[in-house]
């Protein structure tokens, strides 16, 4: 019994020493922050899986990198967004929008547009799809696995910024008002040249979730 106890104490002491000897230059820690709000918006059923068809366009319209063509409007409608809650206003959002993301086809090198996923023999080359806010002038940077806007440096274990970054990737952000039954969020999709385009088919897709501010 004494030998067993002694062995256990030695093992615990050894384990403590191992933890104390972790090299701080080769290790670290990530702390995550977030918030759950009272709001209960839902995506309108018929808008959960949309198809948007852009008109055909001549390849000369996309002959140079960053050329865009055929801006095409589309709408995603939310429902049941009344911000009035029985639990007070402490955790009630003021605005709602959409968070567009894709882990497979975001093109970081071309302004976080969406790569052409068409795999048939007659697919267009050097053509992506770009999303825009409804004003037609502000591009939407779709979130991909290389997006870094959400990270902040910690200082001695304390996050320097525990709020959303200035660019929280919430698109179509709209003020929530009492009595709102349906809330349409408007966007634009357009062709985007990553170089001189060749003729062929274009297809891409993006996921989205409701996001609050």
UniProtKB/Swiss-Prot annotation:
Cross-referenced Pfam families, in alphabetical order? Answer: Fimbrial
* Keywords, in A-Z order: Disulfide bond, Fimbrium, Signal
What Gene Ontology cellular component terms go with this record?
pilus
Protein's cellular compartments: Fimbrium
Signal peptide per UniProt: 1-20
**InterPro entries cross-referenced by the UniProt entry:** Adhesion_dom_fimbrial, Adhesion_dom_fimbrial_sf, Adhesion_dom_sf, Bact_Fimbrial_Adh_Pro
Q: Which cysteines does the record link by disulfide bonds?
A: 41-81
Any one GO BP annotation for this protein: cell adhesion involved in single-species biofilm formation
Known function: Mediates adherence to oropharyngeal epithelial cells. Helps the airway colonization process.
Q: Which family does it belong to?
A: Belongs to the fimbrial protein family.
Q: What is this protein called?
A: Major fimbrial subunit
Q: Which organism is it from?
A: Haemophilus influenzae
């Amino acid at each position: 019994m004494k030998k067993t106890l002694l062995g256990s104490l030695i093992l615990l002491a050894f384990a403590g020493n191992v933890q104390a000897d972790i090299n701080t230059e080769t290790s670290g820690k990530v702390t995550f922050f977030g918030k759950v709000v009272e709001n209960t918006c839902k995506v309108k059923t018929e808008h959960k899986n949309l198809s948007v068809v852009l008109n055909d366009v001549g390849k000369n319209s996309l002959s140079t990198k960053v050329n865009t063509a055929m801006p095409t409007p589309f709408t995603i409608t939310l429902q049941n967004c009344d911000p009035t809650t029985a639990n007070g206003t402490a955790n009630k959002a003021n605005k709602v929008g959409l968070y567009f993301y894709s882990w497979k086809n975001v093109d970081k090198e071309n302004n976080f547009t969406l790569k052409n996923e068409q795999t048939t023999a007659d697919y267009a080359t050097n053509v992506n799809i770009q999303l825009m806010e409804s004003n037609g002038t502000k591009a939407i940077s779709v979130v991909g696995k290389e997006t870094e806007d959400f990270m902040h440096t910690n200082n001695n274990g304390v996050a320097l910024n525990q709020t959303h970054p200035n660019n929280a990737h919430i698109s179509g952000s709209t003020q929530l008002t009492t009595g709102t039954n349906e809330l349409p969020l408007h966007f634009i999709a357009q062709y985007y040249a990553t170089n001189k385009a060749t003729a062929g088919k274009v297809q891409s897709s993006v996921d989205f979730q409701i996001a609050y501010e």
